[in-house]
């Protein structure tokens, strides 16, 4: 499941191209369906992806870096999906409130409030799964392995493997989703709504 040097060299450009195409399609679809909030959500999504890659690559010295495996890439993709989902929920709630006749400011307030609970529920569930995976398949002296020792002791020592990379990238991406998909998106939307010339494209 580890990407070999030859495979990595040959497929890197293809992976980057596929990622850019997928992102362009997401931007087009989100903008078409949700207009300005959808476009702003895609900016936050790009920040989430960049921050996730920075954490994985060891750009921040306090966090460990590791070789990116196929399960690790899968974790990043799933976290991106969670980010898109969070932004869709928020944008859809705002759209519903506007269709019900509320003012823009009222729709934003109600939409943010209605969208927060399902976003938190979904992300907390994924965080729990990621922590369990990191505890079960990470180093035996790792933080989560020690914290969950009372759960895993009956199954023998934890087994280090590539699933740990999946859990790590998934946990990192979902936590960053709270920062970018919830907080940053809402700050940008509120900021755009305060600009008179941008109050129409909603």
Residue ranges and their predicted role:
Residues 14, 18, 22, 26, ...:
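Small-residue faces within membrane-embedded alpha-helices
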Residues 58-73, 90-98, 188:
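A cytosolic-side transmembrane-helix exit/cap motif
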Residues 7, 26, 55, 88, ...:
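Residue-level signature of catalytic and energy-coupling elements of molecular machines
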Residues 9-68, 137-140:
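Interfacial segments of transmembrane alpha-helices in multi-pass membrane proteins
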Residues 96-202:
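Hydrophobic alpha-helical transmembrane segments of membrane transport and translocation systems
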Residues 1-4:
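A cross-kingdom feature of multi-pass membrane systems that activates on extracytoplasmic/periplasmic
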Residues 39-61, 73-80, 147-179:
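Small-residue-enriched core segments of transmembrane alpha-helices in multipass membrane transport
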């Amino acid at each position: 499941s580890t990407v070999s040097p030859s495979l990595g060299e040959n497929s890197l450009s293809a992976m980057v191209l596929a990622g850019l195409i997928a992102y362009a399609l997401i931007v087009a679809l989100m903008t078409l369906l949700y207009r300005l909030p959808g476009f702003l959500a895609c900016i936050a999504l790009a920040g989430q992806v960049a921050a996730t890659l920075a954490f994985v690559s060891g750009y921040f010295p306090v966090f460990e870096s590791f070789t990116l495996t196929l399960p690790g890439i899968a974790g990043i993709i799933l976290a991106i999906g969670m980010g898109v989902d969070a932004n869709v929920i928020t944008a859809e709630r705002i759209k519903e409130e506007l269709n019900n006749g509320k003012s823009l400011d009222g729709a934003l307030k109600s939409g943010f409030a209605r969208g927060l609970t399902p976003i938190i529920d979904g992300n907390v569930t994924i965080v729990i799964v990621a922590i369990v995976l990191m505890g079960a398949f990470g180093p035996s002296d790792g933080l989560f392995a020690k914290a969950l020792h009372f759960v895993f002791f009956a199954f023998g020592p934890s087994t280090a493997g590539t699933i740990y990379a999946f859990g790590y990238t998934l946990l990192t991406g979902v936590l960053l989703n709270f920062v970018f998909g919830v907080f940053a998106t809402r700050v940008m939307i509120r900021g755009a709504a305060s600009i008179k010339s941008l109050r129409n494209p909603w």
